[in-house]
A protein has these predicted regions:
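Sec-dependent signal peptide recognition
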Residues: 11-16
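C-terminal motif of bacterial Sec signal peptides marking the signal peptidase cleavage site
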Residues: 23-24
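Active-site signature of cysteine proteases
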Residues: 28, 41, 130-284
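N-terminal regions that are enriched for targeting/export leaders
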Residues: 28-38
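Active-site nucleophilic cysteine motif
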Residues: 47-62, 89-101, 228
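Structural recognition of the beta-strand scaffold that forms the well-ordered cores
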Residues: 51-54, 77-82, 99-102, 110-112, ...
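Papain-like cysteine protease catalytic cores
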Residues: 72-139
Length: 284
């Protein structure tokens, strides 16, 4: 009997210590004050694909339309399927401009028309009682030249286009070069004016913490790599008043903010590769 009681107590002690350990490992989410939060469709997961650029750029286009009162939900699966069937496509990786090029080439369909890449591609797209070909539908949600890609580098002249030498830029797309401070102010103004924005940058830094849902510049290396794309859907401030962009990611919803992430202005200044936003917002 004594052995049984001791064993039972040991079990209870084990469960208690396990609970305390898990509690100590859990992180209390940081508190942010939301200044601007633009509309967006549900956060998705890109799974094992390299299509973050497609998720992010389509999310920016969706936000642009949602804030204009349109109900738009777009299919990444369509783009994935069309690329897989195109022998000229060199890589599944890409940049925001890659998505714009792809829908210009293949067209686009609504999310409900094709949710998975192995679904049968529809011949037509239907929205608000109208029937479109995929090319017509793509043009209706994103006209050619509607978006521009901005970058910032000291190695090229400002206020001019340059071709970034990046593995993901296998199409040799160009970015319009602006000073870093201008890139930040243009992006912030776009979000405040309720426009959709796609961000591309370095997420390999220790300061980028997906599990906590926060990216800060406190721990940053000197080099910048082109790792990931996200949509910018809002603006916020932390408890100390530091400004942040609210990012819509494509890694599912298992973080403290249901798939959103708060990225500091300091991180943006030092780790941005490109930003894609409506061309009308940029004076050239």
């Amino acid at each position: 009997m004594r052995i049984i009681i001791t064993f039972a107590r040991m079990k209870r002690l084990f469960y208690l210590l396990s609970a305390l350990f898990l509690l100590s490992c859990s992180v209390e989410p940081e508190h942010f004050t939301i200044d601007v939060l633009n509309g967006y469709t549900p956060v998705k997961s890109q799974g094992s694909t390299n299509l973050c650029w497609a998720y992010a750029m389509l999310a920016a286009i969706e936000t642009e339309h949602i804030m204009q009162g349109d109900s738009v939900h777009l299919s990444v699966a369509w783009v994935e399927r069309m690329m897989a069937e195109d022998s000229t496509v060199r890589s599944q990786r890409g940049m925001g401009q890659t998505l714009l090029n792809m829908i210009g080439r293949y067209g686009l369909v609504p999310y409900d028309a094709m949710k998975r890449a192995d679904d049968i591609p529809p011949r037509f797209a239907f929205m608000l009682g109208a029937t479109y070909t995929p090319q017509e539908f793509a043009h209706s949600v994103c006209a050619p030249g509607e978006y521009i890609g901005l970058g910032t580098t000291d190695d090229e002249p400002y206020n001019a286009f340059f071709t970034p030498d990046l593995p993901d830029n296998w199409e040799h797309n160009q970015l319009y070069n602006v000073p870093a401070d201008s890139l930040l102010s243009i992006t912030e103004r776009a979000v405040r004016q309720h426009h959709g924005v796609c961000w591309e940058g370095d997420t390999s830094e220790p300061g980028f913490d997906w599990k906590r849902g926060v990216a800060r510049e406190s721990l940053i290396s000197g080099s910048t790599t082109d790792d990931h794309c996200m949509a910018i859907v809002g603006l916020a401030r932390d408890a100390e008043g530091e400004p942040f962009f609210i990012m819509k990611n494509s890694w599912g919803t298992k973080n403290p903010y249901d798939g959103l992430l708060f990225l500091s202005y300091g991180y943006f200044l030092r780790k941005t590769v490109a930003v894609y936003l409506p061309t009308c917002l940029v004076s050239r």
